[in-house]
UniProtKB/Swiss-Prot annotation:
A motif (Microbody targeting signal) lies at residues 548-550. It catalyses: firefly D-luciferin + ATP + O2 = firefly oxyluciferin + hnu + AMP + CO2 + diphosphate. Produces green light with a wavelength of 562 nm. This is Luciferin 4-monooxygenase. GO terms for biological process: bioluminescence. Its EC number is 1.13.12.7. Its cofactor is Mg(2+). InterPro entries: AMP-bd_C, AMP-bd_C_sf, AMP-binding_CS, AMP-dep_synth/lig_dom. GO terms for molecular function: ATP binding; CoA-ligase activity; metal ion binding; Photinus-luciferin 4-monooxygenase (ATP-hydrolyzing) activity; protein-folding chaperone binding.
Length: 550
């Protein structure tokens, strides 16, 4: 029996859930903003070029009509493979308007990774930037379902392939009026909007099928002044988060629903980032945790006028309490706004409410959702400050992994609870805290050791720039906690000094008995999430090379 009082439910939504598909809602919102002359949708910070809502709306509608006339419908899928750019969301919106599923592809994937991703999504059309064309051509040779390749970042045809603009011109009738276009209506619970790549942290990435309903719920959260954004004209957001990732995709679609200006970066540059905060009077900045350690120690921040900055939001991977507090202090902010979600939950389902941040917490349960923490062994629902696996339930949860019912059933139980694989607890104020990944826990002589705790301790040392912890296989103990460490430039430490430093702050089971390996870079995914598998591989290789246990 579940204890109802230990199931935490989100509050009533600030706005009711709107009718219609994600495409219909985006079309309605963007058409409204397009009719306000000069309203800017996107700015590319690198080249200082703007594009208005009118221009964006018109091109997205033209693409929708052209794709429809080409023969695409709710039975088809497209891939968008590009770095962050002014054009990225044009085919995304066009497809959503007519019910074609969009499968964003990581533009830095190699051919093998792209082939795996597209084998799952089975796209008919691929939209790609010029620099990714050759990889897509090589994939097409092995995946003949790809009928057409369209170049996103060229006004004219490129190497014999149509650009988006010539594709549109060749398929639209004379006199086509974008403002007369009506998006398609269909069942938003059954029609897939997006197929996102799962993190792949436990194997090859899987295709996460997200119906239109999930995006519609996300839009409700985006409009919410407590869990989302206050809809204030001329709000400017700075984002360096990859658009192909769920974090970047659904935050940006939410910004378009709200009519915000999105200042994008496709590559992080510290001075450009800070100058953009100042020059564009940015109110909210979106970062992945990889960049927080950098800003915690930056000496450049005070050179810029950041008086308009209201918040910095973090997502995509865990952010330690200490690093978050340090960055908030450097930017003169009361705290860092965090969110927690999985690709399989569409977007964040735990969010720091406006004005209610708590250091180290990832937020409270959002509207339409409920969450619980269960005992790892018995599955019993736990109470306040008790650690177990976080489970969530609500209407943004995926419909399933594409063509993989076994993996779907392993993640979502018969009652609709998604088992996150994250160790968490909630406090007396119903703030949730993520402790570690269930599969990342190190099993030392029967004790469970959380790598995140040791990583946080390591990052507090002034000589350590970055660190990752994993379990080193051991015949006697099961696993030994071990670390990879990047030292601050110009600083020196011995392995023993680091081991002794950690030992002085932890119980005996948590000591770094597997030792320390010095590296130039800690392996991480694109959003800053530590790659435990690669860290473990480095540690095992170092041990085979003669490294002794401590």
């Amino acid at each position: 029996m579940e204890d109802a009082k230990n199931i935490k439910k989100g509050p009533a939504p600030f706005y009711p859930l709107e009718d219609g598909t994600a495409g219909e809602q985006l079309h309605k919102a963007m058409k409204r903003y397009a009719l306000v002359p000069g309203t800017i949708a996107f700015t590319d910070a690198h080249i200082e070029v703007n594009i208005t809502y009118a221009e964006y709306f018109e091109m997205s509608v033209r693409l929708a009509e052209a794709m429809k006339r080409y023969g695409l419908n709710t039975n088809h899928r497209i891939v968008v493979c590009s770095e962050n750019s002014l054009q990225f969301f044009m085919p995304v919106l066009g497809a959503l308007f007519i019910g074609v599923a969009v499968a964003p592809a990581n533009d830095i994937y190699n051919e093998r990774e792209l082939l795996n991703s597209m084998n799952i999504s089975q796209p008919t059309v691929v939209f790609v930037s010029k620099k990714g064309l050759q990889k897509i051509l090589n994939v097409q040779k092995k995946l003949p379902i790809i009928q057409k390749i369209i170049i996103m970042d060229s006004k004219t045809d490129y190497q014999g392939f149509q650009s988006m603009y010539t594709f549109v011109t060749s398929h639209l009738p004379p006199g086509f009026n974008e403002y007369d276009f009506v998006p398609e209506s269909f069942d938003r619970d059954k029609t897939i909007a997006l197929i996102m790549n799962s993190s792949g942290s436990t194997g090859l990435p899987k295709g996460v099928a997200l119906p239109h309903r999930t995006a519609c719920v996300r839009f409700s959260h985006a409009r919410d002044p407590i869990f989302g954004n206050q809809i204030i004209p001329d709000t400017a957001i700075l984002s360096v988060v990859p658009f192909h990732h769920g974090f970047g995709m659904f935050t940006t679609l939410g910004y378009l629903i709200c009519g915000f200006r999105v200042v994008l970066m496709y590559r992080f540059e510290e001075e450009l980032f800070l100058r953009s905060l100042q020059d564009y009077k940015i109110q909210s900045a979106l970062l992945v945790p990889t960049l927080f350690s950098f800003f915690a120690k930056s000496t450049l921040i005070d050179k810029y006028d950041l008086s308009n900055l209201h918040e910095i939001a973090s997502g995509g991977a865990p952010l330690s309490k200490e690093v978050g507090e340090a960055v908030a202090k450097r930017f003169h902010l009361p705290g860092i706004r965090q969110g927690y979600g999985l690709t399989e939950t569409t977007s964040a389902i735990l969010i720091t409410p406006e004005g209610d941040d708590k250091p180290g917490a990832v937020g409270k349960v959002v509207p339409f959702f409920e969450a619980k923490v269960v005992d790892l062994d018995t599955g019993k629902t736990l109470g306040v400050n008790q650690r177990g696996e976080l489970c969530v339930r609500g209407p943004m949860i995926m419909s399933g992994y594409v063509n993989n019912p076994e993996a779907t059933n392993a993640l979502i139980d018969k009652d609709g609870w998604l088992h996150s694989g994250d160790i968490a607890y909630w406090d007396e104020d119903e703030h949730f805290f993520i402790v570690d990944r269930l599969k990342s826990l190190i099993k030392y002589k029967g004790y469970q050791v959380a790598p995140a705790e040791l990583e946080s301790i390591l990052l507090q040392h002034p000589n350590i720039f970055d660190a990752g912890v994993a379990g080193l296989p051991d015949d006697d103990a099961g696993e030994l906690p071990a670390a990879v460490v990047v030292l601050e430039h110009g600083k020196t430490m011995t392995e023993k000094e680091i081991v002794d430093y950690v030992a002085s702050q932890v119980t005996t089971a948590k000591k770094l008995r597997g030792g320390v390996v010095f590296v130039d870079e800690v392996p991480k995914g694109l959003t800053g999430k530590l790659d435990a598998r690669k860290i473990r591989e480095i540690l095992i290789k170092a041990k085979k090379g003669g490294k002794s246990k401590l």
